[in-house]
């Protein structure tokens, strides 16, 4: 049998660095919903492809949006 070819996964590029965005606004819920799961959890960097600084900014913005009740807190599904 031939050996399966192992391909490296394509590196994701930070969406904010690519667009030269100045920052992440907690009031922009449409943008922030891309970075939370259907359960309301913040997605990891390796999933979203964000750089370190922008992932921190997204996490802070999501937490602020939750405080103001623009985004839901995590649900357990019980």
UniProtKB/Swiss-Prot annotation:
The gene is rpsR. Belongs to the bacterial ribosomal protein bS18 family. GO terms for cellular component: cytosolic small ribosomal subunit. One of its GO terms (molecular function) is structural constituent of ribosome. It comes from the Bacteria. Keywords: Ribonucleoprotein, Ribosomal protein, RNA-binding, rRNA-binding. Part of the 30S ribosomal subunit. Forms a tight heterodimer with protein bS6. It holds the Pfam family Ribosomal_S18. This is Small ribosomal subunit protein bS18. HAMAP family: Ribosomal_bS18. InterPro entries: Ribosomal_bS18, Ribosomal_bS18_CS, Ribosomal_bS18_sf. Binds as a heterodimer with protein bS6 to the central domain of the 16S rRNA, where it helps stabilize the platform of the 30S subunit. Gene3D superfamilies: Ribosomal protein S18. GO terms for biological process: translation.
């Amino acid at each position: 049998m031939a050996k399966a070819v192992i391909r490296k996964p394509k590196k994701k590029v930070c969406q904010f660095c690519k667009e030269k965005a100045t920052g992440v606004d907690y009031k922009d819920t449409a943008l922030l919903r891309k970075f939370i799961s259907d359960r309301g959890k913040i997605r990891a960097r390796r999933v979203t492809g964000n750089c370190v600084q922008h992932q921190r900014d997204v996490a802070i913005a999501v937490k602020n949006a939750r405080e103001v009740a623009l985004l839901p807190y995590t649900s357990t599904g019980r």
